[in-house]
A protein has these predicted regions:
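Membrane-embedded alpha-helical segments of integral membrane proteins
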Residues: 2-34
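Short, Lys/Arg-enriched, disordered terminal segments
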Residues: 1-11, 37-38, 146, 178-179, ...
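Hydrophobic alpha-helical segments of integral membrane proteins
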Residues: 6-14, 59, 63-67, 235, ...
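Hydrophobic membrane-insertion alpha-helices, especially the h-region
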Residues: 43-57
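Short, aromatic-rich membrane-interface segments at the entry and exit
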Residues: 24, 39-44
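Periplasmic OmpA/Pal-like peptidoglycan-binding modules at the C-termini of bacterial envelope proteins
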Residues: 219-239, 243-245
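Structural signal for the C-terminal ends of transmembrane alpha-helices
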Residues: 30-38, 55-57
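A structural signal for short, hydrophobic/glycine-enriched beta-strand patches
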Residues: 53-229
């Protein structure tokens, strides 16, 4: 338990340190307060360059395409879809669900279920916080039942607090229910798929990743040259995943 907490805290600190916005702020502060004044213009120019690079949609898209898992699942059907948590706020409850920007994984799951591509839905995840008692999987299950998904088609794993535990506890749940020989479609956000798939491949489950087709490249002038503030956040998320992936490699989780 202590090791889990230390690993969790260290990963959060490291995630903050690789945030491009953090780098830009540091460079701007150096441009204002560096003792050697002749270096201040260099820091300012560096900050401007980083701002342009990390707010450029085309640069981000090209980089992300290299990171993204590619998989064609057309016309395949699966016994169950495994839906990873991380799509609601810690302030959520059964009566008041606050979805975040990662709710695409839930929408994709619903679409796949109603198309008959997945027969059952396994929801995995408690919360990504050591201090929260939130059981995200239970909340999502209640939501799915309210919107018409049959209760018997939903399976919950509500103990895991990170991607590694998602894989471990999901495998245990499937073995308990004698589902470990099923075919599974792994459903999460695209940026998170590489680490998730690697964790689940370490289990004995038959896993296939669900990946949507990439967006077409835009050639309008605004997309190509106008900086986008939301892209800074996308870079933060991507760097967090890259760091998380290699930390998991170091720990032997993937």
């Amino acid at each position: 338990m202590i090791f889990t907490k230390v690993f969790f805290i260290f990963s959060k600190i490291l995630s903050f340190a690789v945030d491009p916005f953090f780098w830009i702020i540091i460079l701007l502060l150096l441009a204002l307060f560096a003792k050697k004044k002749y270096r201040r213009p260099r820091y300012l120019v560096s900050a401007l360059i980083l701002t342009f690079v990390f707010s450029s949609s085309p640069i981000y898209k090209i980089t992300f395409e290299y990171w993204k898992i590619k998989q064609d699942i057309t016309y395949q059907k699966f016994d169950a879809g495994i839906l990873l948590g991380g799509m609601i706020s810690l302030s959520s409850s059964d009566e008041n669900i606050l979805f975040n920007e990662y709710n695409d994984r839930l929408l994709n799951t619903l679409e796949l279920f109603h198309k008959g591509i997945i027969k059952k839905i396994i929801i995995t995840g408690a919360s990504g916080s050591l201090s929260s008692d939130l059981k995200e999987a239970d909340i999502i299950k209640s939501f799915l039942i309210r919107i018409g998904v049959p209760r018997e088609k939903i399976i919950v794993e509500n103990q895991s607090k990170n991607t590694h535990e998602n894989a471990i506890y999901t495998e245990l749940t499937c073995k308990e229910l004698e589902m470990d020989k099923y075919s599974f479609l792994l459903i999460t956000s695209d940026y998170h798929m590489r680490r998730s798939l690697s964790c689940f491949k370490k289990t004995g489950l038959n896993i296939t990743p669900y990946v949507k087709e990439s967006d077409e490249f835009h050639f309008d002038l605004e997309y190509l040259i106008v900086p986008q503030t939301n892209v800074l956040f996308k870079w933060k998320v991507l760097f967090h995943e890259i760091v998380g992936y290699f930390m998991y490699k170091l720990m032997g989780y993937v």
